[in-house]
């Protein structure tokens, strides 16, 4: 299998929608934010975003060991008071885990668990692994936990939430666009999406339900694991007595530029595909709305297809063939007055022959036409 080939598995049809039917609707933000059943979800989401931002910005404070100093007024003067921050206990706890038999399995298990949405905290575990285990051992632990967690998420969405995901592909424009890009782009698009800033929970759900072969997904996930070394290296930098901000800023800059460039490329393709999906949906709906024209299609000369077919069939069954007879000269078809000399050969006569289907009545009289004439042997 080439790098651009992805083995696609035909998806099952979700209940309630035909295989090719979609229902892409513009997002009603007012309804989405203000409906009572969504309020609790938005509150939880805001809390998660705030905690994630705090952890990302103050990650060095979370894992460093030392007292936090602040000043308080005592008897009109200033006195320095040493207080312990609760997050300072993370590194000592990680050091204790390191000395446990098989303690390195604990961060792997934690990374697997938090790989399932909506859990978070991957950055903190990666930083602690860099602080406690160093660069390469820490990277190996983080890579193993991340890979196994993504594989678990892939199987969970494929077999437990498949129907929901397939319905989402037909109702969510962003989800459907990413699925279309994945199917059309092949292995390299899967790899770029894994490298980009698109949340892995979202992309893994798309990959698991849009027909991407598991081994293609596994290879792309494995090749993008070096992204994790940036977080582990930041943890290593925190151990320096006099940390230099330059390496840390360079690491952050490289990671930021790579992920944003990849995400921008995927976003550009998604905007283009969204227009195509909307156009295809409109064409399908117009086709379904048009009445059936099988019995009313005009052929261009004023005769309908069905009427023309009847006319031709009946005309072929009603014919007159010249028959040789004793008289020569003027010959007229049966039941029709003579209008002039016959064109039949000398010694022939003409006679109308009716079909068994309509004896006695020329079928073409139904259409107000003269019956077809021919020749018949006597």
UniProtKB/Swiss-Prot annotation:
InterPro entries registered for this protein in UniProt: Golgi_membrane_TVP38/TMEM64 (IPR051076), VTT_dom (IPR032816)
Topology of this chain in the membrane: Multi-pass membrane protein
Pfam families: VTT_dom
Membrane-side (Lumenal) residue stretches: 1-37, 121-123, 235-249
Chain positions covered by the region annotation Disordered: 1-20, 322-378
Cytoplasmic face residues: 59-99, 145-213, 271-378
Subcellular location: Golgi apparatus membrane
GO CC, any one term: Golgi membrane
Main location: Golgi
Ranges of Polar residues composition bias in the record: 340-358
Keyword vocabulary terms for this entry: Golgi apparatus, Membrane, Transmembrane, Transmembrane helix
Region (VTT domain): 130-238
Record bears the keyword Membrane: yes
Spans through the membrane: 38-58, 100-120, 124-144, 214-234, 250-270
Origin: domain of life: Eukaryota
Keyword match GTP-binding: no
Family per record: Belongs to the TVP38/TMEM64 family.
Domain remarks: The VTT domain was previously called the SNARE-assoc domain. As there is no evidence that this domain associates with SNARE proteins, it was renamed as VMP1, TMEM41, and TVP38 (VTT) domain.
Function recorded in the entry: Golgi membrane protein involved in vesicular trafficking and spindle migration.
Name of the protein this chain belongs to: Golgi apparatus membrane protein TVP38
Gene from which this protein is expressed: TVP38
């Amino acid at each position: 299998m080439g790098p651009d080939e992805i083995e696609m598995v035909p998806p099952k049809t979700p209940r309630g929608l035909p295989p090719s039917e979609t229902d892409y609707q513009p997002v009603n933000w007012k309804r989405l934010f203000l409906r009572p059943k969504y309020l609790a979800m938005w509150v939880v989401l805001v809390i998660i975003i705030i905690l994630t931002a705090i952890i990302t910005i103050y990650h060095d404070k979370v894992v460093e060991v030392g007292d936090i100093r602040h000043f308080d007024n005592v008897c009109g003067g200033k006195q320095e008071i040493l207080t312990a921050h609760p997050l300072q206990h993370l590194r000592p706890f990680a050091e204790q885990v390191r000395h446990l038999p098989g303690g390195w399995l604990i961060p792997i298990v934690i990374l697997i668990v938090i790989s399932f949405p909506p859990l978070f905290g991957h950055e903190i575990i990666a930083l602690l692994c860099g602080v406690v285990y160093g660069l390469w051992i820490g990277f190996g632990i983080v890579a193993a936990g991340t890979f196994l967690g993504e594989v678990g998420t892939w199987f969970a969405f494929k077999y437990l939430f498949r129907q929901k995901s397939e319905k989402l592909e037909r109702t969510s424009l962003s989800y459907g666009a990413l699925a279309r890009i994945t199917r059309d782009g092949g292995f390299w698009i899967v790899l770029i999406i894994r490298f980009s800033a698109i949340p892995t929970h979202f992309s893994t759900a798309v990959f698991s339900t849009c027909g991407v072969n598991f081994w293609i997904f596994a290879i792309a996930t494995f090749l993008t694991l070096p992204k994790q070394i940036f977080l582990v290296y930041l943890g290593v930098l925190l151990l320096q007595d006099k940390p230099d901000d330059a390496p840390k800023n360079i690491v952050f800059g490289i990671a930021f530029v790579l992920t944003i460039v990849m995400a921008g490329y995927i976003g550009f393709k998604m905007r283009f595909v969204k227009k195509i999906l909307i156009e295809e949906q409109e064409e399908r709906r117009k086709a379904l709305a048009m009445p059936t024209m099988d019995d009313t299609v005009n052929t261009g000369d004023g005769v309908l297809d069905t009427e023309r077919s009847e006319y031709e069939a009946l005309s072929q069954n009603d014919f007159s063939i010249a028959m040789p007879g004793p008289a020569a000269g003027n010959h007229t078809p049966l039941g029709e007055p003579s209008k002039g000399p016959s064109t039949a050969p000398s010694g022939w006569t003409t006679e109308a022959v009716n079909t068994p289907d309509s004896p006695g009545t020329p079928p073409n009289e139904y259409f107000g036409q003269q019956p077809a004439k021919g020749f018949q042997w006597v």
